[in-house]
From Swiss-Prot:
Residues 31-99 form the BTB domain. Residues 197-207 have a biased composition (Basic and acidic residues). There is a cross-link at residue 229 (Glycyl lysine isopeptide (Lys-Gly) (interchain with G-Cter in SUMO2)). It comes from Homo sapiens (Human). Residues 305-325 have a biased composition (Polar residues). The lineage of its organism: Eukaryota, Metazoa, Chordata, Craniata, Vertebrata. This is Zinc finger and BTB domain-containing protein 46.
């Protein structure tokens, strides 16, 4: 008993320590850093910030301690509201999230590289949108009928919105990463229903039980019956009985594919689809012109739909899906129905809604508002992709890259593995990080073999060597020395200056060249007929520009500057009056 040893952990000490630190922060006791966000000052302790955020850890560990004064840090990316919630979390371990600040907090957390807060905001958004991402969940949708009257259209519209919230394309289920062992994992949303002909078709015998032949849109085009073939579907999914149909017939939510006749035509081999439980077979009888059909129902506006450019006279049978329909096709239709509902076209909603339907409409409007908030911050969140590592890749799992919130094939997961130890830069490949590190170390490993100039990238050095290997050279008309740069011999594109170097011009050799005119006995050709080739090409100023304007990275200057030079020097110059050699050669210097 005398040698007894026990390692005890008292969890209350954590809360007590955070409470004391928070009180010190609120009273400004021992605060050694001030964080300025949007003009608002937040006092804090460096140790707490450094221990909570990888951004502050990188920032404060690289800065040498020069004085005992408080450090002032300016954060221009994040907002004051978002940073206040984050700094309160650092000192209390409690994160206050609301529908108003979740986007700002998520953006600030991604910038500060706090993956725990990013994941919490991610879960909060999923819970707010009531999204389920269970892979084995079976979605049963109530069947409804699209009637001709406005009241039945309104009921169908509300039912579609409420049923589609669980499969909204905004938070579509992600697929497995395309390359889990590579440098990045990119998962795309299922592109169901976005184009025709995605489903495979196989021969099937006609049967009276699975045919819904009642046309839903009147028109000149005659459509054949719609047939649905189900494979690998257990009867237990339906509870031993079929789903109740609404009124006269079942309405299936599926886009039909055009066909030339009644017979079933196989279109090709089976494709790799996410939902392989069903194989749907749909045929139509269309006119000889085989016009493209429009997927827009008659009770919805066609002006704001993505398919509005198609033939407005073409009709299409749209039927409500059972649980065997593919998830992607239902997602697209519900997205379009929800967009039509929330797009401001009140004339299509018919008479006033019942209280239950009114609540559903308000709930759908709240979802749309949150979606708009996400889209407004999407560009800002995309800028933070570089500062995230493997732990923070879920931030961009459900955020589309495109500008449209309903682009089903634009969902991407961003994962970057290699991080810079000096700044927040991260890269997907080690070679990119190695090249980035040269900006911190000043290393230039690629020297020019001719002139010794060094470059950070090999391609810049190769482009620079073209200056030395080019055929265009400039020869002084007096001493016949060869120069690589036109400026060395006083040649500029579009000017009247002759090929005389600075040394020869200083000895007074340019006087007779200037007064000689063109081609006479005083011209350069007459004075120096064969001393060396004069290879100036006035139509190609690029060689001079590459030598004179190439910066540290080997980048050539803008062509606009050359054009301005040309305009300047093509303008007539007043001849200098005779009166001394200094005045005669002033324009040569």
């Amino acid at each position: 008993m005398n040698n007894r040893k026990e390692d005890m952990e008292i969890t209350s000490h954590y809360r007590h320590l955070l409470r004391e630190l928070n009180e010190q922060r609120q009273h400004g006791v021992l605060c050694d850093v001030c964080v300025v966000v949007e003009g608002k000052v937040f006092k804090a302790h460096k140790n707490v910030l450094l221990g909570s955020s990888r951004y502050f850890k990188t920032l404060y560990c690289q800065v040498q301690k020069t004085s005992e004064q408080a450090t002032v840090t300016h954060l221009d990316i994040v907002t004051a509201q978002g940073f206040k919630a984050i700094i309160d979390f650092m000192y209390s371990a409690h994160l206050a999230l609301t529908s108003r600040n979740v986007i700002e907090v998520m953006s600030a957390a991604s910038f500060l590289q706090m993956t725990d807060i990013v994941q919490a905001c991610h879960d909060f958004i999923k819970a707010a949108l009531d999204i389920s991402i269970k892979s084995d969940a079976s979605d049963e949708l109530a069947e409804f009928e699209i009637g001709a009257s406005s009241s039945s259209s309104t009921e169908a519209l509300i039912s579609a919105v409420m049923a589609g919230r669980s499969i909204s394309p905004w938070l579509a289920r992600r697929t497995s990463p395309a390359n889990s062992s590579g440098d990045s994992a990119i998962a795309s949303c299922h592109d169901g229903g976005s184009s025709y002909g995605k489903e495979d078709q196989e021969p099937k015998a006609d049967g009276p039980d699975d045919v819904s032949s009642q046309p839903l849109w009147p028109g000149d085009v005659g459509y054949g019956p719609l047939r649905i073939k189900e494979e690998q579907v257990s009867p237990s999914q339906y509870g031993g009985s079929e789903l109740p149909s609404a009124k006269d017939g079942a309405v299936q939510n599926s886009f039909s594919e055009q066909s030339a006749g009644d017979a079933w035509q196989p279109t090709g081999r089976r494709k790799n689809r996410k939902n392989k439980e069903t194989v749907r077979h749909i045929t139509q009888q269309v006119e000889d012109d085989s016009r493209a059909s429009s997927p827009v129902p008659s009770f919805l506006p066609t002006s704001g739909w993505p398919f509005s450019s198609r033939d407005s006279n073409a009709d299409l049978s749209v039927t409500e899906a059972s649980s065997s329909d593919s998830r992607g096709e239902r997602a697209e239709l519900y997205a379009q129905v929800e967009e039509g509902l929330l797009g401001g076209e009140a004339s299509y909603l018919g008479p006033p809604l019942t209280p239950e339907k009114d609540d559903a409409l308000h709930q759908a409007t709240a979802v749309a508002n949150l979606r708009a908030a996400l889209m407004s911050k999407n560009s800002l969140l995309s800028l933070k992709a570089d500062v995230l590592g493997d732990d923070g890749s879920l931030l961009f799992e459900y955020l589309p890259r495109g500008a449209h919130s309903l682009s089903l094939n634009e969902f991407t997961v961003i994962r970057k593995k290699f991080k810079c130890p000096y700044c927040s830069f991260s890269a997907m490949h080690q070679c990119i990080l190695k090249r980035h590190m040269r900006s911190h170390t000043g290393e230039r490993p690629y020297p020019c073999e001719i002139c010794g100039k060094k470059f950070t990238r090999r391609e810049h050095m190769k482009r620079h060597t073209l200056v030395h290997s080019k055929d265009k050279k400039y020869v002084c008309k007096v001493c016949s020395r060869v120069f690589m740069s036109a400026a060395s011999v006083g040649i500029r594109h579009g000017s009247r200056r002759h090929g005389v170097c600075t040394d020869c011009a200083g000895r007074g050799m340019a006087g007779p060249l200037d007064h000689g005119g063109g081609g006479g006995e005083g011209s350069p050709e007459a004075l120096f007929p064969g001393d060396g080739p004069y290879l100036e090409d006035p139509e190609d100023p690029r060689g001079e520009a590459e030598e004179l304007g190439e910066d540290d990275e080997g980048l050539a200057p803008e062509d606009a500057l050359l054009a301005d030079d040309k305009d300047e020097e093509d303008s007539p110059r007043p001849r200098s009056p005779p009166g001394g050699p200094d005045k005669d050669f002033a324009w040569l210097s």
